[in-house]
């Protein structure tokens, strides 16, 4: 992602969704270009705001843990081997052409799986992005509690029940209902996610720096 800014990531994601429709959720790592600035509390970045504006739930994986991004990392590895390392590219245009061919071939190989996936709605023709609009919808963060059962999230520390230490939690930030719900999460049984805690949460109303 060297050379990719939050603005260009936003534009590329929007271009992809215009072409292929809107997913129900989009999974990201915790890079500031996707999540927003880490040095300030209650920060929701450009890409997060785009997702919320279009009704897509952004999901941020557990920091510094492997496995959650395995599918995309595998895809990236194949692209590196099949496109980047295999050819000498005279210029950016050549690279983009070869990359587009690879992506198209990958979609053809996955056509059956894509056909089974839920249908993606198109972006509404009257949709207008407003990065200053009040935030609404859900943002999900996957996190791991520390030795005291605490979770660090959005620049705050939340105490989850003490019995759930060093364990995975799904933190569901409900910007519409103004609360955060914490659910236990087990890799062995991902369908079993009992509610551990609900806390009030309201995003401070500040101007987003565009």
Residue positions per predicted region:
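Acidic/histidine-rich, metal-coordinating catalytic segments
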Residues: 4, 17-40, 62-64, 69, ...
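C-terminal, beta-rich DNA-binding module of retroviral/retroelements integrases
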Residues: 103-210
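Short, well-ordered coil/turn segments that N-cap beta-strands
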Residues: 22-24, 56, 152
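Active-site beta-loop-alpha junctions of metal-dependent nucleic acid enzymes
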Residues: 1-25, 200-204
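Short Gly/charged-rich anion-binding patches and loops
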Residues: 12, 45-46
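Short, glycine/acidic-rich beta->alpha junctions
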Residues: 5-9, 42-43, 163
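Mobile-element integrase/transposase regions
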Residues: 7-13, 19-20, 52-53, 139-150
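Charged alpha-helix within mobile-element recombinases
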Residues: 40, 47-129, 134, 175
């Amino acid at each position: 992602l060297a050379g990719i800014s939050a603005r260009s990531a936003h534009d590329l994601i929007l271009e992809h969704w215009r072409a292929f429709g809107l997913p129900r959720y989009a999974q990201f790592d915790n890079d500031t270009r996707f999540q927003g600035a880490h040095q300030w509390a209650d920060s929701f970045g450009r890409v997060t705001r785009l997702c919320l504006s279009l009704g897509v739930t952004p999901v941020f994986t557990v920091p510094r843990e492997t496995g959650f991004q395995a599918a995309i990392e595998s895809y990236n590895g194949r692209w590196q081997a099949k496109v980047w390392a295999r050819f000498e590219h005279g210029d950016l245009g050549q690279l983009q052409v070869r990359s587009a061919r690879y992506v198209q071939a990958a979609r053809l190989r996955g056509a059956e799986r894509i056909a089974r996936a839920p249908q993606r709605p198109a972006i509404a023709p009257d949709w207008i992005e407003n990065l200053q609009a009040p935030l609404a919808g859900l943002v999900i963060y996957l996190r791991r509690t520390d030795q005291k059962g605490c979770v660090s999230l959005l620049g705050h520390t939340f105490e989850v029940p003490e019995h759930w230490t060093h364990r995975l939690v799904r933190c569901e930030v409900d910007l519409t209902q103004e609360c955060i719900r914490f659910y236990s999460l087990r890799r062995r049984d991902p369908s079993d996610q009992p509610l551990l805690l609900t806390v009030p949460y309201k995003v401070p109303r500040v101007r987003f720096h565009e």
